[in-house]
Structures are given as structure tokens and as C-alpha cells.
């Protein structure tokens, strides 16, 4: 008998532990090399653990919901066993297969709308399945990729939940709760995911550790919009990506950070660490919550490079494919609440960074130019900063530098 250990993959230095989500194989079942055995969740990403070798899954050491650390053994595979040897074990439950009706009854609670894993959510969207049409077998009823594949391949399974079609509004609720089934004054206690718990912890840490102050300014977006409208078609044809506004905000931020290095610095104990590089975090929404992937060396990136990377981050965040490396580090962050219609906000600093820029919705507003009232597309900028190391002067002038660069994009080319 040759036994191979299945171990938790390497986690980043900032991730101490992970949670086992859902085993896709049972002891005694045959596995192929690189076949996904389980998904584990860290406070940053969901990782898929593949089988290191082909064989038979002989022992599961860690169960769903268990907390594990990097390199910890979670299962063992017998590489000398064959699929044929595993067949008797798989055949044993055959009598249960003759009674599918109870299984359908058990699946009914899933109509409450189990939380779909990122990989499952993509498959469900492609197959036109709602959460109420898929029975979640993961922890706390979570819908796994295997659940989504099974539901998509079974036409009968799609037709069964038809009575639940009268409750489409439940799909707008993020919690996996069927409130209609809980009485007149419903409540449901749902445990936080590891990512949500980590977000809560870091936000509280930021509020309690940093001396947060926010400065505001308004920017006339007409010059950027005119430039974009003039070149957007040629830009997309040349670079294969649409010219958005975030690349201009990133460039304007880097422009200001070069002028005011303290905004790009961080505190380490009693020291101020000045970073000679510009790694810009871009806040991105995902099915699991807000994540902040990093644009490395943003000062060396073109507008096209930035737009391509942000688009890539959006797809990866939606599919749960962002790597730990992409989510680690950063010297400054940008949060764009404008995509949701936000007019104004006070963003919270992402530790250990010392500042964050909040971008909002661009709206036509009356402004005074040369004594005349004119209509201009205006955007309110908000920069929160750690007042422990950044004085008001640097913060205000830094935000003004961003404003000036956006109102005269030629400054970005001339480095003025």
C-alpha cells in the first residue's frame, strides 16, 4: 500500500488559517490526479485542493467546517488501489438509490436560497438556475460547484421547485433565508463567512488604530470625459479593452503620491516607512464580499495596462479566482462608490496603508466659471488619511494635486 498525503496548500504570510468547506469525495471513492477534492476558505480567497495523485481516497482526516493551517494533512490517498477496488464500497449504498423521493424532500430546504460558492454561482448563472433550484450540500447549505453541475445536468430537478417561483424577491436577499417560511416576524441567524469576519475585524482595527480624518474636493470631469469620448473607439480597437475612468483616477493618484510621499507611506511601530513603489489597491465587489486586489507598480503601467488589469480583477473576483498574491500588500487604495450611485462617502483606510481615495458618481451640476453659472459633470472626491503621520496640509494638497491632474490630463503626460 502506497499512501500519499493530501495537504492544505501554502497560504500567504498574512493568512494564518483556513476553513474546510465541502468534501467532493468520500472515503473509498476513486480519484484522478489533479481532481478537485475540496474547497477551503481563507479570509481572502476560496482555494481548490486537487488530488496530488490518482488512487482511492482512503482516509479523511479533517471534516467540513474544521479549521486548518498550511501544510496540514487533511486526507490520505492509496495510490496502489484502483477504481475497480473501490467499486464495492461505492456499490454498498445501492439500496438507498432506489428511494429518490426522500432525497427530493431533503432538498426542499435548499429552496430557501443557499449561498452559492463563487465557482457555483458562475455555473448557475450560465445555466439560468436560481439558488432555490439547487440543493446545497456544503457547510450550512452552501451550494458547491458539484451541486451546480448536478442541477444543470438534471432537467427534472429544474422543474421540481416550480411552486417556489412565486417568491422571486428572495433572490435579492443576500442571506440564505426563506422569510416567508419563518412566520410573521421572521429572524434567522447566519454565521459570517471567514471573509466577512475578516472584513469586520480589519474595519474595526482601522477605526480603533488610525486617527482617521477625511478631506473633500470636487473635480470637473469634462476634460477627462472629452478625452475619453474622442479616443475611446480607437483605444478599444488598439488595446482590446474599453477606456474607463478608473485608469485616470489611478494615474492621478500616483501623480499626487509622487509629490507627497507621506500619503504613500505607512506606520511600523514608531517608524514611518516610505515606499519607493506605488502599489494601488482597487476595491472590487465579489459574491463573497469586498476584496481589494493590487495594481503592482502602477506608476509603470499605461492606461491600457490598468484597464486590462482592473477588468481581469473584476472577472476573477466574480469567479472567486483571485490569488493570495493579488490580494496582499498595497500602499494606497481607491474605492469607487460611484458605480453604485454614491454621491459622497468617507472611506475607511485599509491597514497598514495610511490613506484611501473615495470616488463617487459624476453628475451634471451648476458651477461658477468666470462669473457665469454653467453646467459641468462634477465628481466629489474624498480622501481619508491617518492623521498620525499625514498632516492636513499634505492631505489637502495631495487631493488638490489629484483634482488638478484630472481637470488637466496633460499634466499626467508632462509630469507637472
UniProtKB/Swiss-Prot annotation:
GO molecular-function term, one example from the UniProt record: dihydrolipoyllysine-residue succinyltransferase activity
The protein's Enzyme Commission number: 2.3.1.61
Catalytic activity field: N(6)-[(R)-dihydrolipoyl]-L-lysyl-[protein] + succinyl-CoA = N(6)-[(R)-S(8)-succinyldihydrolipoyl]-L-lysyl-[protein] + CoA
Main function: E2 component of the 2-oxoglutarate dehydrogenase (OGDH) complex which catalyzes the second step in the conversion of 2-oxoglutarate to succinyl-CoA and CO(2).
Subunit structure: Forms a 24-polypeptide structural core with octahedral symmetry. Part of the 2-oxoglutarate dehydrogenase (OGDH) complex composed of E1 (2-oxoglutarate dehydrogenase), E2 (dihydrolipoamide succinyltransferase) and E3 (dihydrolipoamide dehydrogenase); the complex contains multiple copies of the three enzymatic components (E1, E2 and E3).
Domain Peripheral subunit-binding (PSBD) per the UniProt entry, residue ranges: 115-152
Keywords from the named record: Acyltransferase, Lipoyl, Transferase, Tricarboxylic acid cycle
Domain Lipoyl-binding, residue spans: 3-78
Domain of life from the UniProt record: Bacteria
Any single Gene Ontology cellular-component annotation: oxoglutarate dehydrogenase complex
Active site: 387, 391
Pathway: Amino-acid degradation; L-lysine degradation via saccharopine pathway; glutaryl-CoA from L-lysine: step 6/6
Keyword Transferase in annotation: yes
NCBIfam families: PRK05704.1, sucB
Family per record: Belongs to the 2-oxoacid dehydrogenase family.
CDD domains, sorted: lipoyl_domain
Lineage: Bacteria, Pseudomonadati, Pseudomonadota, Betaproteobacteria, Burkholderiales
GO BP term (any one): L-lysine catabolic process to acetyl-CoA via saccharopine
Gene name in the database record: sucB
Modified residues (N6-lipoyllysine): 44
Cofactor(s) required, per the database record: (R)-lipoate
Protein name per UniProt: Dihydrolipoyllysine-residue succinyltransferase component of 2-oxoglutarate dehydrogenase complex
Cofactor note: Binds 1 lipoyl cofactor covalently.
Amino acid at each position: 500500500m502506497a499512501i500519499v498525503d493530501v495537504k492544505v496548500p501554502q497560504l500567504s504570510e498574512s493568512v494564518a488559517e483556513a476553513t474546510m468547506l465541502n468534501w467532493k469525495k468520500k472515503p473509498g471513492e476513486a480519484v484522478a490526479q489533479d481532481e478537485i477534492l475540496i474547497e477551503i476558505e481563507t479570509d481572502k480567497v476560496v482555494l481548490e485542493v486537487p488530488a496530488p495523485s490518482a488512487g482511492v481516497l482512503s482516509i479523511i482526516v479533517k471534516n467540513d467546517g474544521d479549521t486548518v493551517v498550511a501544510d496540514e494533512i487533511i486526507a490520505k490517498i492509496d495510490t496502489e488501489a484502483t477504481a475497480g477496488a473501490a467499486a464495492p464500497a461505492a456499490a454498498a449504498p445501492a439500496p438507498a438509490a432506489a428511494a429518490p423521493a426522500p432525497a427530493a424532500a431533503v432538498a426542499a430546504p435548499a429552496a430557501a436560497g443557499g449561498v452559492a460558492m463563487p465557482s457555483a454561482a458562475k455555473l448557475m448563472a450560465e445555466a439560468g438556475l436560481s439558488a432555490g433550484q439547487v440543493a446545497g450540500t456544503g457547510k450550512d447549505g452552501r451550494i458547491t460547484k458539484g451541486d451546480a453541475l448536478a442541477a444543470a445536468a438534471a432537467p427534472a430537478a429544474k422543474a421540481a421547485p416550480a411552486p417556489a417561483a412565486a417568491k422571486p424577491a428572495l433572490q435579492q436577499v443576500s442571506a440564505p433565508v426563506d422569510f416567508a417560511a419563518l412566520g410573521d416576524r421572521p429572524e434567522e441567524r447566519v454565521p459570517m463567512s471567514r471573509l466577512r469576519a475578516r472584513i469586520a475585524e480589519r474595519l474595526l482595527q482601522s477605526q480603533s488604530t488610525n486617527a482617521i480624518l477625511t478631506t473633500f474636493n470636487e473635480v470637473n470631469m469634462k476634460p477627462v470625459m472629452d478625452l475619453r469620448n474622442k479616443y475611446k473607439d480607437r483605444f478599444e480597437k488598439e488595446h482590446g479593452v474599453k477606456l474607463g475612468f478608473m485608469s485616470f483616477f489611478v494615474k492621478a493618484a500616483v501623480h499626487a503620491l509622487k509629490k507627497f510621499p507621506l500619503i504613500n507611506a505607512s506606520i511600523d511601530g514608531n517608524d514611518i516607512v516610505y515606499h519607493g513603489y506605488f502599489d494601488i489597491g482597487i476595491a472590487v465587489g465579489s459574491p463573497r464580499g469586498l476584496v481589494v486586489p493590487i495594481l503592482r507598480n502602477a506608476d509603470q503601467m499605461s492606461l491600457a495596462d490598468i484597464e486590462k488589469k482592473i477588468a481581469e480583477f473584476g472577472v476573477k473576483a466574480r469567479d472567486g479566482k483571485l490569488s493570495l498574491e493579488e490580494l496582499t500588500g498595497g500602499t494606497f487604495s481607491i474605492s469607487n462608490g460611484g458605480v453604485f450611485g454614491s454621491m459622497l462617502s468617507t472611506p475607511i483606510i485599509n491597514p497598514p496603508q495610511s490613506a484611501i481615495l473615495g470616488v463617487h458618481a459624476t453628475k451634471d451640476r451648476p458651477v461658477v466659471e468666470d462669473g457665469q453659472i454653467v453646467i459641468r459633470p462634477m465628481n466629489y472626491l474624498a480622501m481619508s488619511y491617518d492623521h498620525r503621520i499625514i498632516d492636513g496640509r499634505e492631505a489637502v494638497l495631495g487631493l488638490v494635486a489629484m483634482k488638478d491632474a484630472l481637470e488637466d490630463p496633460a499634466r499626467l503626460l508632462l509630469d507637472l
